[in-house]
Amino acid sequence: MPARRRWFENRPVLKRIVLAVLALVVLPYVLIFFYLLPFIHPVSTLMLRDLVLLRGYDRRWVSLDEISPVLVQSVMMSEDGQYCFHGGVDWAEMRMLVEDTLKGQATRGGSTIPMQTAKNLFLWNSRSFVRKAMELPLAVSTDFVLSKRRLMEIYLNIAEWGPGIYGIEAAAQHHFKVPASKLTRRQASLLAVSLPNPIDRKAGKPGRGLRRLAGVIERRAQGSGEYIKCIYE
């Protein structure tokens, strides 16, 4: 037996740690295939955190057919206009993000909906290069395995829309007292633009800046026909 392998075998604690880390790395890729099944309703790491801390949360799973199309249009135009055309990562956007970072300039988020979904399902919330490096292959794998419709359905059912508010049905009921299927264009656009910072951006009580952003997204959503074909064709 080589000396290096013998050294490793003689340290059972280290061996268990390495195996546990490997299992944690592989587990998300296994779960992606389980999420192909429509009756499985995934939860996010933030939901799990709330459960562990005994905070509780509100999430009511709904199928994509039970969500107003104007909400889907608004979210896509706000968060990922190229959703139907990339394979999980918008590499042109990522390239600009890296260039801005190297120049020391303020950077945009650059996260596609598959990237946000991978982060919400498997990773932590705070920004770091380590998280981003893990997020990219998970996003590509998620986009490859799941259909665009299923991926969007999962995203809209795990996204955070306020403290303890997860998923579009709970968000619509909490902010506007209507089901997700009955959201208006203005309500949908307000929910969409609150996604980057759902704790501070209150869709149900928007300030002037949020209303202005929502107006821009509302207009974009009305002309989004070509951009959403992968969802509704």
Curated annotation (Swiss-Prot):
Q: Name one GO biological process term.
A: peptidoglycan biosynthetic process
Q: Which domain of life is it from?
A: Bacteria
Topology versus the membrane, per the UniProt entry?
Single-pass membrane protein
Q: Which GO terms describe its molecular function?
A: pentosyltransferase activity; peptidoglycan glycosyltransferase activity
Work out whether the entry's keyword set contains Repeat.
Answer: no
The residue ranges crossing the membrane are 17-37
Q: Which InterPro entries match?
A: Glyco_trans_51 (IPR001264), Lysozyme-like_dom_sf (IPR023346), PBP_transglycosylase (IPR036950), Pep_trsgly (IPR011812)
Where in or outside the cell is it found?
A: Cell inner membrane
Q: Name one Pfam family in it.
A: Transgly
What HAMAP family does the entry give?
Answer: PGT_MtgA
Q: Which family does it belong to?
A: Belongs to the glycosyltransferase 51 family.
Role: Peptidoglycan polymerase that catalyzes glycan chain elongation from lipid-linked precursors.
PANTHER family, per the entry: BIOSYNTHETIC PEPTIDOGLYCAN TRANSGLYCOSYLASE, MONOFUNCTIONAL BIOSYNTHETIC PEPTIDOGLYCAN TRANSGLYCOSYLASE
List the protein's name: Biosynthetic peptidoglycan transglycosylase
**What species was this sequence derived from?**
Rhizobium etli (strain ATCC 51251 / DSM 11541 / JCM 21823 / NBRC 15573 / CFN 42)
